[in-house]
UniProtKB/Swiss-Prot annotation:
Signal peptide segment: 1-17
Subcellular location: Periplasm
One GO cellular component, as annotated: periplasmic space
Keyword GTP-binding included in the entry's annotation: no
Protein's name according to its UniProt entry: Tungstate-binding protein TupA
Source organism of this protein record: Campylobacter jejuni subsp. jejuni serotype O:2 (strain ATCC 700819 / NCTC 11168)
Keyword terms: Periplasm, Signal, Tungsten
Keyword Repressor: no
Mutant phenotype after disruption: Mutants contain the same concentration of molybdenum but they show a 75% reduction in tungsten concentration and a 50% reduction in formate dehydrogenase (FDH) activity.
InterPro entries tied to this protein: ABC-Tungstate_binding (IPR052738), PBP_domain (IPR024370), TupA (IPR053775)
Record gene name: tupA
Length: 269
């Protein structure tokens, strides 16, 4: 009898469990945040969380192509366009950090005292090796917008090199080339931790109001994609934006430094 009850219970649990497919960015993956959230979510929901980490552009395309139930991304303009086209629903801001410019420590003195615009002009005028993601990610979109504000993206210049890689891999390329790169702070802290607190690339510009980096979750629209698990995607969005989970994200640190910020402004994007 006990065996029958155990088998029935196992079958019931199996039937209720689901696999939630998420498309997300390399920055949420590289920082280790998702690895930390995964066991918490799986324990509370009984589901399995699986994700593919790509640039935001590719993540949104996965949603458009019905290959993900939920998206965790960070390019507000692209996200809103995605929503406008009817590919996503329930877009909810979660957290933010900021973008920073980092450079080989031998170049740091060149940037001293310069604001964001002056730092970009320095890179351009002195032809400092600059590594661009070049992958339509949230970081790539932000970087391109900064160059456009300065007159145009210098794609044809030899000093401007596109990696086509994720954030952490692109940082390592910038390190190898003793160059400059725009990154989100969370991934930089992860890189810094990997280098045991002694990174070759250091922060040379930060703090400009335009460099806020907002992350949101979006459910793939079930009216557009009949195959997606909207029920569990919706529950995940409520879970990740609950006070309990947001407090966990706010307390998530490396080198005793928070990687993401939670506050009221985040929730109003």
């Amino acid at each position: 009898m006990k065996k029958i009850i155990s088998l029935a219970l196992a079958l019931a649990l199996s039937a209720s469990a689901a696999e939630l497919k998420m498309a997300t960015t390399t920055s949420t993956d590289n920082t280790g945040l998702l690895d930390a959230l995964k066991p918490l979510y799986e324990k509370e929901s009984g589901n399995t969380l699986k994700w593919v980490a790509v640039g935001t552009g590719a993540a949104l395309k996965m949603g458009e192509d019905c290959n993900a139930d939920v998206l965790f991304v960070h390019s507000p303009k692209a996200e809103k366009e995605f929503m406008k086209k009817g590919f996503g629903v329930d877009r909810t801001p979660v957290m933010y950090n900021d973008f920073i410019i980092i450079a080989d420590k031998s170049l740091a003195s060149k940037f001293k005292g310069k604001n964001l615009k002056e730092s970009l002009e320095l890179i351009k005028n002195e032809k400092l090796t600059f590594i661009s993601r070049g992958d339509k990610s949230g970081t790539d979109n932000k970087e391109k917008s900064l160059w456009k504000n300065l007159g145009g993206v210098p794609e044809k210049q030899s000093w401007y090199q596109q990696s086509g890689q994720g954030m952490l891999a692109s940082i390592k390329i910038a390190e190898e080339k003793k160059g400059v790169i725009l990154t989100d702070r969370g991934t930089y802290i992860k890189y810094e931790a990997n280098e045991k607190g002694k990174p070759n690339l250091v922060i040379v510009n930060e703090g400009d109001d335009s460099l806020k980096n907002f992350y949101s979750v979006i459910a793939t629209n079930p009216k557009h994609c009949k195959n997606v698990n909207y029920t569990e995607a919706s529950k995940f969005i409520k879970w990740v934006t609950s006070d309990k989970t947001l407090n966990f994200i706010a307390d998530f640190k490396l080198l005793n430094k928070p990687l993401f910020v939670i506050d009221a402004k985040t929730r109003k994007d």
